């Protein structure tokens, strides 16, 4: 696996950090000069297609997402409370994980703060957020690097990214850089599957998944994936969005996952397509990864499928018990840091 190293000397300006990343900038186009795309050893891109079929399933139109889910959600009171987080002091060898909500996580080590798929917005265009983030965005610590798994609106929220950008690096899949290059990040790194980058002491690698990356209708060129983060000898895996696919076993063999952040919601999709794992498939993926701890995500925040908001977690607990992994399941509360 390729690994590029970024040195991150820091200059503190108030609570904002400036990062002097020692990385060449190979593009001359001024508006996107901060986008760096890593290539394979022979200079070619190594993208492999693991895109789901985008054609809706038969009879999908017989259900009405607008009438059954979207409009009723507008009248649901947004749940949750903003609570100032109590971030602990992280000792060497420890890692602190804070679930913010949906697929957003703050990963902290004693040297680095990593923010993944951050979204604080109350709306995804017309889809209402039904659960508040665990804390307000100004309670975030200084962020050293941001990771975005793909360009879908519930994972790449430009409004949130603009607020957290403070001249630090951001890492995205191939083809996503032009969506974030103008938001205030010092450098944008585009990765292909199995490519990696070293940010300070943490190794970050892009892993395959079974999904798609278009933000609109015609931009199917955009990449998508998950991130494996090697932190002090332990690997945390953020799956991104995915349906179940055979690649989980390969990811587990390649990265030796300790903590798996796996999506469990939005499986009853409006189009009928299988684009997200259900809770039972998440348990199966966890077993294929041969991971040690399962932390569920991508549920309870936005109602992106027909299933009730409470159903994914209830089904996950039942499935975990049925497969004998209940002790490996760790359900987080939004905004509550957990040290592992």
Which functions belong to the PLM regions below?
Residues 8-113, 336:
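Zn-dependent metallo-beta-lactamase
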Residues 72-92, 172-234, 314-340:
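Metallo-beta-lactamase
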Residues 37, 43-51, 145, 169-171, ...:
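Cap/insert and terminal regions of metallo-dependent hydrolase folds
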